[in-house]
């Protein structure tokens, strides 16, 4: 699989964040994992207000990114909607029900990663 240029990966992660915000996601956070992990470049973490909201947000992100030419490689948790993982290889999206996000605290687990907050336009702050 060809490697995606770093600036394109960043733009895709920002676009995914913007799509989550379009769907009224809460606490949208982008973690830059490049200095601390070879697994992926970014984690995008966001919360929905209910299982239905989380599922709908995941479907919205997948559909919009697919229309723009980026296909998800692996999906987990879509049926339940409590924690949906969308793996795009260079970035991974974690969409949580708030109680599970609080329980797993991925931001704490990856505390060595740079935390990049995202504003309503999807631009990095």
At which residue positions do the language-model features occur?
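Active-site beta-strand termini and strand-to-loop segments that position acidic
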Residues: 86-88
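Long, contiguous binding/interaction regions
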Residues: 1-35, 52, 56, 63, ...
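Short hydrophobic/aromatic beta-strand micro-patches
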Residues: 45-47
